[in-house]
């Protein structure tokens, strides 16, 4: 991939426009989770250290295009950056026709989704953004799967378009995990529905040695193996698909192991009583909410011996502690493993936080949808744009 990297460019005196993913939760005008802001700081600081006049843009939430809405303003982000950066930081509400920004300063643009044409990747809008800078830096992996004016179009028209350190690091880590993985390679794919992760499962089943399924997805595979799943969430219409995926994996010498024991309850609630059962004894009224300790231990052994682990999705309803032991054991196994591990997706990151293993995972992906599309083997529009500009 011939992508220019911001780290390699001379930026002294240059106007640098950085697209970050600063889409953070805000309550009463204050940022409540700053993970994405923290992740963006090294890129912004590097641009300042290189002597640039820095402009930063992002979306926040889902406002109606063409309308200012204070609820989705970037002001709380500006307040945060003012404390985090040792330089002047200001908010530009009107910026498309020009911005005053000096070397050593940071100007944050108001929410890009307030602009009509942002989501449709409007060319006129993209050209206006491109005219503001000498160098455009795409650093938002979380939105790299969307072809929008601030993530794609602007890069086609800017004098120079490059990847920021966060995006470059993300692509390098994903490439290491997927393009040339240390074997055995294990992928853990959780989530509620096979249908939403079908392309991921298909793509990974041709690459990995063991494909571990969890959550509602696993229930469909349990049913495909001929077991009762009671009232559990599963997709009867995808049982044949599940059988095909298992057969494909096994024909390559791999497998998609099905749980041998499960944790069930008769209702979905924080106070539901958890009961451990052999997978062959699930009753008509049971709902499967987690894998049992024997299954968890078997998976932990697979992870322990892995060379590469890709984790996307919990194996149980870990939000309720009585259904969290399976995911906890998986998390511990990843933490203890010598494998190169990469974790991505909102629920996965919540599990990483809950079980305190963030510093034991080799790479934590900032992208949800983009992470999934990369796993599916899809081309990400923003990455394709950077490749074309890097020629």
Swiss-Prot record:
Reaction catalyzed: (2R)-3-phosphoglycerate + ATP = (2R)-3-phospho-glyceroyl phosphate + ADP
InterPro entries, alphabetized: Phosphoglycerate_kinase (IPR001576), Phosphoglycerate_kinase_CS (IPR015911), Phosphoglycerate_kinase_N (IPR015824), Phosphoglycerate_kinase_sf (IPR036043)
Gene Ontology terms describing biological process: gluconeogenesis; glycolytic process
Binding of ATP, residues: 197, 319, 345-348
Pathway as given in its UniProt record: Carbohydrate degradation; glycolysis; pyruvate from D-glyceraldehyde 3-phosphate: step 2/5
One cellular component (GO) term of this entry: cytosol
Cellular location(s): Cytoplasm
A molecular function (GO) term: ATP binding
Keywords, sorted A to Z: ATP-binding, Cytoplasm, Glycolysis, Kinase, Nucleotide-binding, Transferase
Top-level taxon of origin: Bacteria
Ligand binding (substrate): 21-23, 36, 59-62, 113, 146
Broad class of enzyme this protein falls into: transferase
Pfam families according to UniProt: PGK
Membrane-crossing segments per the record: none
PROSITE patterns tied to this protein: PGLYCERATE_KINASE (PS00111)
Family according to the record: Belongs to the phosphoglycerate kinase family.
Subunit and interaction comment: Monomer.
Full protein name: Phosphoglycerate kinase
Originating organism: Shewanella halifaxensis (strain HAW-EB4)
């Amino acid at each position: 991939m011939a992508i220019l990297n911001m780290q390699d460019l001379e930026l002294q005196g240059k106007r640098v426009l950085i697209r970050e993913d600063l889409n953070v939760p805000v309550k009463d005008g204050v940022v409540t989770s700053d993970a994405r802001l923290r992740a963006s700081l090294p890129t912004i600081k590097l641009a300042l250290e290189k002597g640039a006049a820095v402009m930063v843009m992002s979306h926040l939430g889902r406002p109606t295009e063409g309308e200012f809405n204070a609820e989705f303003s970037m002001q709380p982000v500006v307040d945060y950056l003012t404390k985090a950066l040792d330089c002047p930081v200001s908010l530009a509400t009107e910026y498309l026709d020009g911005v005053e920004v000096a070397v050593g300063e940071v100007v944050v643009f108001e929410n890009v989704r307030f602009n009509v044409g942002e989501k449709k990747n409007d060319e006129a809008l993209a050209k206006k953004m491109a005219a503001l800078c000498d160098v455009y830096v795409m650093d938002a992996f979380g939105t790299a799967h969307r072809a929008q004016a601030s993530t794609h179009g602007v890069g086609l028209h800017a004098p120079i378009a490059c990847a920021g350190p966060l995006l470059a690091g993300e692509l390098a880590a994903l490439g290491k995990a997927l393009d040339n993985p240390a074997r055995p390679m294990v992928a853990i794919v959780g989530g509620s529905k096979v249908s939403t992760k079908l392309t991921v499962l298909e793509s990974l089943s041709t690459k990995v040695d063991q494909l571990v399924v969890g959550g509602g997805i696993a229930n469909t595979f349990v049913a495909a193996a001929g077991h009762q799943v009671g009232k559990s969430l599963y997709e009867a219409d995808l049982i044949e698909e599940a059988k095909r995926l298992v057969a494909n994996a096994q024909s390559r010498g791999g497998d998609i192991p099905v749980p041998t024991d499960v944790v069930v309850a008769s209702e979905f609630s924080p106070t539901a009583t958890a009961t451990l059962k052999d997978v062959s004894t699930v009753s008509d009224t049971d709902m499967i909410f987690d894998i049992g300790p024997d299954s968890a231990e078997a998976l932990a052994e697979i992870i322990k011996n892995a060379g590469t682990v890709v984790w996307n999705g919990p194996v149980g309803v870990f939000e309720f502690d009585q259904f969290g032991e399976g995911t906890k054991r998986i998390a511990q196994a990843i933490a203890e493993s010598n494998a190169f591990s990469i974790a991505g997706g909102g629920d996965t990151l919540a599990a990483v936080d809950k079980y305190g293993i963030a510093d034991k995972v080799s790479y934590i992906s900032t992208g949800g949808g983009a992470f999934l599309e990369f796993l599916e083997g899809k081309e990400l529009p923003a990455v394709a744009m950077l490749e074309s500009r890097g020629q």
